[in-house]
Amino acid sequence: MNNTTSKKSSNFQQALWLGIGQFCTFAMTFVSAAILSRFLDKTEYGTYKQILYIYSTLVTLFLMGLPSAFSYFIPRLERGEQKAFINSLNRILVIIGAIISILLFVFSDLIARILENPELATGLKIAAPFPLLTLPCIGVEGIYTALRETKKLAVYHVVTKIFTLSCIITPVIIFGSNYKYAIYGWGMASFLIFLTAMYMKNKPYTKTEAIKVPNMYREIFTYSTPLLGAFIGGSLISMADQFFISRYYGTSVFADYSNGCLNIPFVIMVTTSIKNVLLPLFSKANADNNIESLLQTYNNAVNKSIVLLVPFITFCFIFSKDIMVFIYGEEYATSSIFFKCFIIRELVDILPYFSVLMALGMSRTYMNIHICGAIYMWLTGWMITSSNLPPYLIVVAGSLLQFAIRGYAVISIYRKHHIPLVNKEITKKMAIVIINCLLCGYLSFIISNLIPGNKVACINLILSGIIYYILLIPSGKIIRINYIESILQVIKKK
């Protein structure tokens, strides 16, 4: 890393600004889901979520890991070469967007028949042109993260997410309870964000002349092709529970599932931002044969994440029903079982193994893990539906798979490169914090239920949260875990 780059800001500050952008992304998901689930009935809302599911599945499948290529290549290239690289990747993204748009339109009727929802055909045809607008937007995050200008990226995320949210929910509120209005709003937002993203991607290089990189396309596909298998596997893993629940349990249950299976915004804000900051750092260090020097940075990030995030995850697990009712309304109280089964996987998301795997060039290992995982998920989903077992067991199977994937990745990295991503210190701290949080969480659950009065979800969550941290912070001092310091660090850095 050169001196100019190193002076721009600390890694934590970069992660913090990136985290703010991530928070806006997931906050928009939360708020839009909360509003639409109240204005649309379960069938309409389920159809809307199915369209998003099909769209996101195809995008993930066809991108072949290209978004991470921005963070991987840019730190390795000179300024002029970076501009040529971005232009090359933009052309690839436009082509992929066109392919996805054609597939959505042509196969909309077939997809609707497979998922046994005739209304899907109309919705998919309306949404078919959107990939042409949304895919070229990919890369803004990778560019500004690699250039260590994440403050600008945070502003971009805040503005675009607020605008997207307004475009999606306003037509539904004004014109009526129909999912098509939300799709139309999404399309309008996509067009304006496309213009903004193109400006953002070109802005750092307006005074830079592009320098052609020899065999650039070959380099891009050499990097991304091994990831293709991994992302196909990852897409199939993601598709499995959505497909089986959508097809065999109905649109209404799918609405419950889709509302329950969502990440906690604050947790994803932290874990994703750390991953995105570490990837270019590890990539540069690996190119300089100095990756061991970053292990302390990695360990510090993981230890801080454990103390900061495990209490949030535990609280959400214990008070899942109140959270679902508060966000979506009493009608979606049944989403709590899906939410509880889903968020346990966020405990292993604290380990940013992906950054290390990619920096070490272990994309083939990543591919093999996900292909095996896809086979497991589809076999498990088939067995659960064939046995008429409850749908939440499919989500449990998916969460267990995420634990297995992280475990295998950590072992593979250690065997091949002797890099211990999970040491005794991390394991011990994780175990102690989880036990401490569970004890305080269930005790606060019991105490809050003994308090007489109004059991409105919002009030119950506030009271329970206060009791939870009143118990957690002093007990943390006994076991030498400073929970309050981890929170104050985030506030002070802001």
Regions found by a protein language model. Give the residues of each.
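Signature of the first transmembrane helix
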Residues: 9-71, 97-105, 130, 161, ...
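Membrane-interface helix-loop junctions in multi-pass transport and translocation proteins
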Residues: 37-44, 147-152, 162-195, 363-364, ...
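Membrane-interface junctions at transmembrane-helix termini in multi-pass inner-membrane proteins
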Residues: 133-156, 343-375, 382
